[in-house]
C-alpha cells in the first residue's frame, strides 16, 4: 500500500507566526500534529519539541512492540510519550527565560 501524506497549517487571522508542528514517520505510519498555544510565549518551540519527541519515542515503541500490541497498550504508550514530551517542554520553559509559559 502506498501512502501520500500532505500537511498544511495556518496561523489564522489573529497571529503573525504559525505555532503548529507536524511530524510523520513513514516506517511506523505515525503522524503527529501539535498545536502551539497562541498568545503565549514560544508556542512554535513547544509544538516543535512535542512533535519531534513523540515521533522519536512513539516511533521507536511502535517499531519494537507495536505490531503485537493491543489497543490498550498502544493507548498507554501514547499517554506516556505525551507525558514525557510535556515534562521536556516544561523543563525547557523553566530553564530558558525566553521560553517561559510556552506550551502546546
Where in this protein do the model-derived segments appear?
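PP2C/PPM-type serine/threonine phosphatase catalytic domain
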Residues: 1-104
Amino acid at each position: 500500500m502506498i501512502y501520500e501524506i500532505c500537511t498544511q497549517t495556518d496561523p489564522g487571522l489573529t497571529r503573525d507566526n504559525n505555532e503548529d508542528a507536524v511530524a510523520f514517520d513513514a516506517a511506523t505510519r505515525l503522524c503527529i500534529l501539535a498545536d502551539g498555544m497562541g498568545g503565549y510565549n514560544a508556542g512554535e518551540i513547544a509544538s516543535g519539541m512535542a512533535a519531534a519527541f513523540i515521533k522519536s519515542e512513539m516511533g521507536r515503541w511502535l517499531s519494537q512492540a507495536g505490531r503485537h500490541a493491543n489497543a490498550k497498550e498502544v493507548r498507554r504508550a501514547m499517554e506516556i510519550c505525551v507525558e514525557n514530551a510535556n515534562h521536556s517542554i516544561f523543563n525547557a520553559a523553566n530553564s530558558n527565560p525566553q521560553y517561559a509559559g510556552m506550551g502546546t
